[in-house]
């Protein structure tokens, strides 16, 4: 490595190559989506905390999912909004590495929380008489905390491998935030180990957990079909359909981006997929759960009636 090599200490996020007018339109639109994300997920967390009838394992995990979605959006969207207003405004090296680490942490944690939530539904429908014994508060807390810890530890592995790399090729990141594969393309050193770990990590936290969710829901479907009453079947399907929608949105986009073919898939297409993944998914999750969930809707109505009475 030459002594005259200049190392990069800040990056410029290229974002989306659009006209200034279109960038201002996207700024207004994404700001609105961001506000809806914070409001929707914040409302879910608030309702679960306020109503003791929602103090059950299912809503306990849902509150953690809402917190992850808030953190997910707060990590990527503000920087994206800044770049829409000022496309050449740089992000520091430390800020970029922090954003990469936090994105991976929240993404992995959400993967694992969705698995835990599917297991909760499996126990509730397939083993209803043993549900309280199996899904005790100690077990639920352990599952939630373990999901967060694994998310942090796996992200630390990627960060430790990323930090020693010198960046001297270019300071322009072809993305709207510091996404790890886009950052690796700027390194002026061998990144084969990093790329292998990204793929291995994606397979371990996406394909493996998704397979376990599929198995859980296969068992759930079998149990639902054995229910005699149509009302019981309808209620069971309604309980699981919200979670299945969220699983499909999250895992579908994530698997295409990180486990799909390395070649032949346009970079811009994956960038827009990740935009959907990081901006629209967190906004849609509270809508999916609240629209399909009578408990959440009833709690919201009670809170609104109480506020009007005051």
Swiss-Prot record:
Listed GO biological process terms: G protein-coupled receptor signaling pathway; sensory perception of smell
Keywords for the protein's UniProt record, in alphabetical order: Cell membrane, Disulfide bond, G-protein coupled receptor, Glycoprotein, Membrane, Olfaction, Receptor, Sensory transduction, Transducer, Transmembrane, Transmembrane helix
Origin: domain of life: Eukaryota
Main location as per UniProt: membrane
Localization per record: Cell membrane
CDD domains in the cross-refs: 7tmA_OR2A-like
Glycosylation site positions: 4, 194
Transmembrane portions of the chain: 25-45, 54-74, 97-117, 149-169, 205-225, 240-260, 274-291
Stretches assigned to the Cytoplasmic side: 46-53, 118-148, 226-239, 292-310
Signal sequence coordinates: none
GO molecular function: G protein-coupled receptor activity; olfactory receptor activity
Disulphides: 96-178
Segments on the Extracellular face: 1-24, 75-96, 170-204, 261-273
Tissue expression: Olfactory epithelium.
Pfam families from the UniProt entry: 7tm_4
InterPro entries listed in its UniProt record: GPCR_Rhodpsn, GPCR_Rhodpsn_7TM, Olfact_rcpt
Record GO cellular component, one term: membrane
Record's bilayer topology term: Multi-pass membrane protein
Record-stated family: Belongs to the G-protein coupled receptor 1 family.
Summary of the function given for this chain in its UniProt record: Odorant receptor.
Name listed for the protein in its UniProt record: Olfactory receptor 2A7
Organism name: Mus musculus (Mouse)
């Amino acid at each position: 490595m030459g002594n005259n090599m200049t190392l990069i200490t800040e990056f410029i996020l290229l974002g989306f190559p659009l006209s200034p007018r279109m960038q201002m339109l996207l700024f207004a639109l994404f700001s609105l989506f961001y506000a809806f994300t914070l409001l929707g997920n914040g409302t879910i967390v608030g309702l679960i905390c306020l109503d003791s009838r929602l103090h059950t394992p299912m809503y306990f995990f849902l509150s953690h999912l809402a917190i992850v979605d808030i953190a997910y959006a707060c990590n990527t969207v503000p920087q994206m909004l800044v770049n829409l207003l000022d496309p050449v405004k740089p992000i520091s090296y430390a800020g970029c590495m922090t954003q990469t680490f936090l994105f991976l942490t929240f993404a992995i944690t959400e993967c694992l929380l969705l698995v835990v939530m599917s297991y909760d539904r499996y126990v509730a429908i397939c083993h209803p008489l043993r549900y309280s014994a199996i899904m005790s508060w100690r077990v639920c807390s352990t599952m939630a905390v373990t999901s967060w810890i694994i998310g942090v530890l796996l992200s630390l592995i990627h960060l430790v491998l990323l930090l020693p790399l010198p960046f001297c090729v270019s300071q322009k990141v072809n993305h709207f935030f510091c996404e790890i594969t886009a950052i690796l393309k700027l390194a002026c050193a061998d990144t084969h180990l990093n790329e292998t770990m990204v793929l291995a990590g994606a397979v371990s936290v996406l394909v493996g957990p998704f397979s376990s969710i599929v198995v859980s829901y296969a068992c759930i479907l079998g149990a639902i079909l054995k229910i005699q009453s149509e009302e019981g079947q309808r209620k069971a399907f309604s309980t699981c359909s919200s979670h299945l929608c969220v699983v499909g949105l999250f895992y579908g986009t994530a698997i295409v981006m990180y486990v799909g073919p390395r070649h032949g898939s346009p970079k811009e297409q994956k960038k827009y997929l990740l935009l959907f993944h990081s901006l629209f998914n967190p906004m849609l999750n509270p809508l999916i759960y609240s629209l399909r969930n009578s408990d959440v809707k009833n709690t919201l109505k009670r809170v609104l009636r109480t506020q009007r009475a005051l």
